[in-house]
Amino acid sequence: DEKSHQRLWLNRSFFDERWSRNRCVTSLDWSPQFPELLAASYHHNDDAPNDPDGICLIWNTKFKKTTPEYIFHCQSPVMSTTFARFHPNLILGGTYAGQIVLWDNRVQKRTPIQRTPLSASAHTHPVYCLNVVGTQNAHNLISISTDGKMCSWSLDMLSQPQETLDLQ
């Protein structure tokens, strides 16, 4: 059968010696606005205790660059990442500490411009799933954590969830 002889070929690897060495990838997401951009979140590097625990690298698959397009980091390993649909410059991360962080690629800083509080009203365990749902004019960020909570957030106000559902 001709189909059984089809093979996959490695076209390209995305690796940065400084930022992705000894880190496992925890999440991937393609940009809905810029299909050539791929966000990859990474866990901490045990061999580099002075480096940030959480990293999110934005790779450009269109150009043959050997370095990420953007480098973002935070104080906790990033377990999930997503591009903010309807906001082409915003990238969200769900952390091991239970926080959600927001990066903006227009700002000349690698740390989050906004983050959720460490609070019992929000997540208290790792955030493994993030998704922006809704329409251009009415949308929310949905987050799910191993604490059994699903939270709904406004991207304009990450100080507290708009709604929390206990899934247990």
Language-model segments: residues:
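Acidic and/or Ser/Thr-rich intrinsically disordered tails and linkers
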Residues: 1-58, 111-117, 148, 152, ...
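Surface loop/turn motifs at the tips and blade-to-blade linkers of beta-strand repeat domains
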Residues: 17-20, 71-74, 118-122
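Loop/turn segments within WD40 beta-propeller blades
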Residues: 30-35, 81-89, 130-139
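Short loop/turn segments that connect beta-strands within the blades of beta-propeller domains
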Residues: 34, 52, 74, 87, ...
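Structural core positions within WD40/WD-like beta-propeller blades
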Residues: 38-39, 91-92, 142
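Short loop/turn segments that connect beta-strands within beta-propeller blades
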Residues: 61-64, 105-108, 156-158
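Repeat-solenoid scaffold signature
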Residues: 115-153
